[in-house]
A protein has these predicted regions:
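Bacterial N-terminal signal peptides
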Residues: 8-18
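Bacterial N-terminal signal peptides that target proteins for export
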Residues: 1-9
């Protein structure tokens, strides 16, 4: 009887691993709708051999990309990001973790963060899904730490959109003089607004982070964007002062 119970437990364990592996693989594959829309899967769910470069500190495991030590960002070198594009990805963090997705030359970063613990979560302009140190999301749409979030970046012309878990949280047109202060912040950090042709980069910030379902497509010239505007979250006065000092430090370090 005992041997039979052990055998049954082993079978269920194997089935569980198989189901887990199957589910992990399926999220990295293109759906029919994604294929029809022109998406390309950048991560195959098995390894990082299809164009990803790193210094031995990233790995693919159980259908997920994760870092396993310091060494720098994970960069997709097989092709550059198109001028007008849509990028989808899933991400999750551990308690206090920080990472980011870089998608245009300079400091265009979709912030990846545990808002509740990391210090950057105190400032909406550096919180999860922000255009880091430029534009705050309209609200905190993150899921609890340890759960998967769905990120999405849409860029066409001068319009930049950040989405999180199905909600558009940033709609930013950098040709609009309304956002001059925000644009100045981005440029001080090194972003070149008209520049295009970056390689997708997943930031190593020294913290545990996981990515999967990384999918990219070129936006057709005749495709219309969701133009509904969203307003960035308000930032408290004391947080703005801390932000000013932090930006000053960043600028000074860049001068050295």
């Amino acid at each position: 009887m005992r041997n039979r119970l052990i055998l049954v437990a082993a079978v269920f364990s194997i089935l569980g691993l198989t189901i887990q592996s199957s589910n992990a693989g399926s999220v990295n594959e293109l759906s029919e709708a994604e294929s029809a829309a022109g998406f390309e899967a950048l991560f195959n769910g098995r390894n990082l051999d299809n164009g990803w470069e790193h210094k031995g500190n990233w790995k693919a495991e159980n259908g997920v990309v994760t870092r396993e030590g310091k060494g720098g960002s994970l960069v997709y070198k097989a092709k550059k990001i198109p001028d007008d594009f849509e990028l989808k990805f899933q991400w999750k963090v551990a308690k206090g973790s920080n990472s980011g997705v870089y998608y245009r030359p300079g400091q265009y970063e979709y912030q990846i963060l545990d808002n509740g613990v990391h210090n950057d979560g105190k400032n909406p302009r550096t919180s999860a899904a922000s255009l880091y140190f430029c534009m705050a999301p309209s609200h905190d749409a993150t899921k609890p730490v340890g759960e998967w979030n769905e990120g999405r970046i849409v860029c066409k012309g001068t319009i930049i959109q950040h989405w999180l878990n199905g909600k558009k949280v940033i709609h930013f047109d950098y040709s609009d003089s309304k956002w001059k202060f925000n644009i100045d912040m981005l440029e001080k950090r090194g972003a070149k607004l008209p520049a295009r042709g970056a390689h997708l980069s997943l930031q190593d910030h020294g913290d545990p982070v996981w990515y999967r379902a990384i999918k990219l497509r070129t936006l057709p010239a005749d495709e219309k964007l969701d133009v509904k505007k969203v307003e960035p979250a308000k930032i408290a006065a004391d947080v703005l002062e801390a932000e000013r000092k932090k930006l000053e430090g960043i600028v000074n370090r860049r001068k050295k």
